[in-house]
Amino acid sequence: MSKVEAQIEKIFTSFDKDGDGNLSWDEVFSRMSSNSNIKDPLAATKSMFDHYNRDADTENLSIQEIREVLMSKKIKQDLIRTEKALRSKVKDFRKKYDTDNDGVVTFDEMYQLYLKDPDFDEEDDELSAEEREKAKCRRAKSSCRYFFSAVDKDKNDKLSYLEIHEYLKKHPEFDLGPSQ
């Protein structure tokens, strides 16, 4: 049982005075009346029955009815939080890589940032500085090509908001990559 389901069970049990597994109108009204924060217990009881009573049984509320409504709300809230986090990540991605602020991330914009990243530096001491620089350029270009091949669906060497969004949605573990 999840934490949310345990909380639902606890609240339900506090309403279910006769312990029959259902909430009668009287049980709900009694509980609403005993809460000093509720100014109109009759309206609150009616509202609760209107909101949670999903079957033809208008006399009682089952824990299953309440659980279904609350869990569907929780799922919706989780989806909203996930979408907000995803939008924030897309915004951060564009802020980092869309260096000319034209609304798309080009291959060249990403490549130029990769070239500044020390993670792409070649550390082979036997290579000359020029050879190390060429190796770094090859590695940065290869990484950009690989990323663009996965994300750039229309193959125009530009990443749109939608392309970035769809990729990050499928790959939530994605790290924004090299530091600036």
UniProtKB/Swiss-Prot annotation:
Keyword Acetylation: no
Domain of life per record: Eukaryota
UniProt xrefs under InterPro entries: EF-hand-dom_pair, EF_Hand_1_Ca_BS, EF_hand_dom
Positions annotated to bind Ca(2+) 2: 98, 100, 102, 109
Binding-site list for Ca(2+) 3: 152, 154, 156, 158, 163
A Pfam family: EF-hand_5
Residue intervals of the EF-hand domain: 3-38, 40-76, 85-120, 139-174
UniProt-annotated binding residues for Ca(2+) 1: 16, 18, 20, 22, 27
Gene Ontology annotations of biological process type: aggregation involved in sorocarp development
Keywords recorded for this protein, A-Z: Calcium, Metal-binding, Repeat
Molecular function via GO: calcium ion binding
Protein name: Calcium-binding protein E
